[in-house]
C-alpha cells in the first residue's frame, strides 16, 4: 500500500514509522531541516532507548510523490490552508485521508445527524477551501491517544500510549475503515473502530481545550496545572459548559470533569503540544481547540 504522511511531526512520524516497518511504501511531505534529515537518515523513531530508521521517499512538493492509497494528515490546524492548496496530486479516486489531528476538524458536522448537521464551521474553514479540497467522502476520522515528541528534525520519540481510534464521519463500519484498522493493527498499533468518531474527538478535546491553552499561557506542565485548586476549578467549569454543548449537538459525555482530571494527572510533568508549540515559536491551534467550541 502506498501511504503518504503529510506532516512529519511527532504523531505523523510515529504513525509513518509503524506503517513503514509493516511493509507499506511510505512517503513524507516535509520541508526545511526535517526534509533534509529524512533524505539523509530516513524516518527515525526512538522508543525504549532504541532508535530505528525506515527508508522513506520525501519531498516538499506533493506532486513528486504521486497518487497514494492513504494519506495520513498529521499537521497542525494552522497549516491546513496550505495543505488544501497542495494536496491534490496525492489524491486518486479511491484515496483515503486519515485525519490524525487535535481539535475540531472542518468535516466535524458533515457526517452525522443532530441539530447542526451539515453546518460548516467558519472558525476552522472560513472560506470552505478545506471542504472543497478534502470533502467528507474522502475522510476517515482519527483520534490519537499517545504521547510523542520530536527529538530533532526527522526523529521522533514515542513515550507512552499506543491507541488509535478510527471512524467514518457517518458512523458506518465500512469495508475501507475495517481494512484500515487491520493495516494499522498489523503495524503495531492498538486500534478501535468507533460508531461515532465525533464523540471520541469531542472527548479528547474536552481536556485539550482547557489544559492546552492554560499551559501555553503559563508555561506550566500538566502536573502543576492539576495541583492548583483554583485553576483546576476553572477548568472544571469550562468543561461543564463544553459538556452541555456536546449534549445539545448529539455527542454527550457520560463522565464528569474530575474523571478526566484523573487521566490528566497520570501524564505527570508533561508539556502539552500547545506549550511545545509556544516554546518552538509556532502558530497555535486556538481555532480548532477553542474557537470552534465557542462557535
Residue ranges of predicted features:
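NAD(P)+-binding Rossmann beta1-loop-alpha1 motif at the extreme N-terminus of oxidoreductases
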Residues: 1-50
